[in-house]
Amino acid sequence: MANVHHISVPSKVLFQKARKLVPPMLEKFHKGQQGRVAVIGGSLDYTGAPYFSAMASARLGCDLSHVICESSAATVIKSYSPNLMVHPILPSSASVKDPSSIDAPSLASPIIAMLGRLHALVIGPGLGRDGVTLKVVTEVMKEARSRSIPFVLDADGLLLVTENPDLVKGYKDCILTPNVNEFSRLAKALNIEVPSLAQISSKESGDKTSKEAEACEKLSQALGGVTIIQKGPHDVISNGVTSIVSDLPGGLKRSGGQGDTLTGSLGTLLAWRAAYHDALWDSGEQEHSKEAENKEEVQGELESNKRMSPSTTLLLAAWAGAAITRECSRRAFKAKGRSMQASDLTDEVHESFLTLIGEPEGSKVPERL
């Protein structure tokens, strides 16, 4: 891995450090401080994906989980769970008089008005490819970026980046979660040469990961340091400066919708990350003001009791989200085998969190029976 800035930190150490990002359960907190996350997606054809993503956010532990969707999807998503706040304010061609002539900033204004109340966005689950919808979401992304609101992009949210990489280029508070096909399309759009599946498959296990990490790092660099989770047998995570691999065992069933558990988990982890950097509680770490700028400094923060800088916490949040999702998949597959569905992962989010990360010191939670 000569060209890859890969770090190797034991999973146990990473989970201990990830626990530092988790707000303890304390009487002093009020509603919303432990995370306000919104999923932007949900259309006539796709209602499951935003639900699975928003429920993963809720089950991991955010206080308020929103879905911003097209009106055609709202009632369906509401019927799935009363725990989600569903807002039918995402325009589509069916909801405007003249789809060929729209004022996208004006149509986006109801969504933009919500941004001040949110810690993180998940953009893409069930979004679809309606032209009006994508133009409106583009405006929302621009505004979120201008306000430094972190967001996760998946599915058709990634299509927007493929068509206009400048939307995220250089934005360090963004996580992309492409599968192998989405990764290839992004790489092609940015003229990044990546090894084919056949080339990767012909390599030994360690070399496969090396090739994937190198490609992931190159794509991140081309996007100016955006964090990328390249999903696969091993999840490769890179911000262009530092790369890390999530290789916990997962399930073997490749049913659709499992990536929505990842995006929702990431949404909550990004919200917790914001609370961590706002110092809403004492993490017990030594104060440390220097930003980690290279692989060695990131690894140093992860392996010490120093307070982490934003670049380190973003990489750690991405790794933790991937690890939790893999554990959800493993548990669900063990219970359901070939019949496993995306909803089975939702049921495993909390137990997976407790098994891998656990409640932080000082949390006042009831003892388990």
Curated annotation (Swiss-Prot):
YjeF C-terminal domain boundaries = 14-356
Q: Which domain of life is it from?
A: Eukaryota
Tell me its EC number(s), please. 4.2.1.93
Binding positions ((6S)-NADPHX): G126, N179, V180, N181, E182, F183, S184, R185, D260
Bias (Basic and acidic residues) ranges = 284-306
The chemistry this enzyme catalyses reads: (6S)-NADHX + ATP = ADP + phosphate + NADH + H(+); (6S)-NADPHX + ATP = ADP + phosphate + NADPH + H(+)
The protein's matches in InterPro entries, at most eight in alphabetical order, are given as: Carbohydrate_kinase_pred_CS, CARKD, Ribokinase-like
Q: Which UniProt keywords apply?
A: ATP-binding, Cytoplasm, Lyase, NAD, NADP, Nucleotide-binding, Phosphoprotein
HAMAP family in the cross-refs? NADHX_dehydratase
Q: What is this protein called?
A: ATP-dependent (S)-NAD(P)H-hydrate dehydratase
Q: Which organism is it from?
A: Emericella nidulans (strain FGSC A4 / ATCC 38163 / CBS 112.46 / NRRL 194 / M139)
